[in-house]
Amino acid sequence: MAACIAAGHWAAMGLGRSFQAARTLLPPPASIACRVHAGPVRQQSTGPSEPGAFQPPPKPVIVDKHRPVEPERRFLSPEFIPRRGRTDPLKFQIERKDMLERRKVLHIPEFYVGSILRVTTADPYASGKISQFLGICIQRSGRGLGATFILRNVIEGQGVEICFELYNPRVQEIQVVKLEKRLDDSLLYLRDALPEYSTFDVNMKPVVQEPNQKVPVNELKVKMKPKPWSKRWERPNFNIKGIRFDLCLTEQQMKEAQKWNQPWLEFDMMREYDTSKIEAAIWKEIEASKRS
């Protein structure tokens, strides 16, 4: 009987060895295979084309329907408005017709005193028959076909100013490099200011601005050279806001300049020039010219 028990024991041990050998040949279960592949090494995504890949939702576009729509900003060039007291409307009407015809050939952009412009003109004495000049607009003057503007720039330490006729046939292009306003309607005092306020790179690139955006106002105040100046800019009749008078004049000189002050002129209603009706009539002429 002992021999039978020993034979059965050895048979059971042989069967267990054969079973373990068979398990090593079989493929592992799916759960074990997943645990093996999901190790510390992270699989790289093949991109959004892979089925089931995560795609972020599009950003919502929020439209405020209660916000009032900003009206289109219209600009009427100042040379279209005749001077006060002129009583010959036919002459100005004929001039405006010629001005509108010229604007169909040459694009005259919106610009103000303080804007930086680049003007290209025909020059028979230049190598390429054209010349360019970049500078800051320091003054706009004249009415009708005689409208002019002055550009100023400091080149090699020397101040250079060129007065361009706005409707001159030699003007080929007027490019606004930087559109902005200043605190004053005339910047002729830059002639007496430090050169750094009139120095601009001739290769300056244009500054992009939205079409309906308000024109920015540059509140820069310049420092002046020591006296004498070309004019007495400190006197109230010039009404200059863009000069640091506290750095170049004493308190006694400022009090002396106030002797020429005429504060009653601010309340003189006869000096006001209402151009609303004239502007409305001119806009009708401009719209009719665009349709023709």
Curated annotation (Swiss-Prot):
<keyword id="KW-0809">Transit peptide</keyword>
<dbReference type="GO" id="GO:0003735">
    <property type="term" value="F:structural constituent of ribosome"/>
</dbReference>
<dbReference type="GO" id="GO:0005739">
    <property type="term" value="C:mitochondrion"/>
</dbReference>
<keyword id="KW-0597">Phosphoprotein</keyword>
<comment type="similarity">
    <text>Belongs to the bacterial ribosomal protein bL19 family.</text>
</comment>
<dbReference type="Pfam" id="PF01245">
    <property type="entry name" value="Ribosomal_L19"/>
</dbReference>
<comment type="subunit">
    <text>Component of the mitochondrial large ribosomal subunit (mt-LSU). Mature mammalian 55S mitochondrial ribosomes consist of a small (28S) and a large (39S) subunit. The 28S small subunit contains a 12S ribosomal RNA (12S mt-rRNA) and 30 different proteins. The 39S large subunit contains a 16S rRNA (16S mt-rRNA), a copy of mitochondrial valine transfer RNA (mt-tRNA(Val)), which plays an integral structural role, and 52 different proteins.</text>
</comment>
<keyword id="KW-0496">Mitochondrion</keyword>
<protein>
    <recommendedName>
        <fullName>Large ribosomal subunit protein bL19m</fullName>
    </recommendedName>
</protein>
<dbReference type="GO" id="GO:0005743">
    <property type="term" value="C:mitochondrial inner membrane"/>
</dbReference>
<dbReference type="InterPro" id="IPR001857">
    <property type="entry name" value="Ribosomal_bL19"/>
</dbReference>
<keyword id="KW-0689">Ribosomal protein</keyword>
<dbReference type="InterPro" id="IPR008991">
    <property type="entry name" value="Translation_prot_SH3-like_sf"/>
</dbReference>
<dbReference type="GO" id="GO:0005634">
    <property type="term" value="C:nucleus"/>
</dbReference>
<dbReference type="GO" id="GO:0005762">
    <property type="term" value="C:mitochondrial large ribosomal subunit"/>
</dbReference>
<dbReference type="InterPro" id="IPR038657">
    <property type="entry name" value="Ribosomal_bL19_sf"/>
</dbReference>
<dbReference type="GO" id="GO:0032543">
    <property type="term" value="P:mitochondrial translation"/>
</dbReference>
<feature type="modified residue" description="Phosphoserine">
    <location>
        <position position="77"/>
    </location>
</feature>
<keyword id="KW-0687">Ribonucleoprotein</keyword>
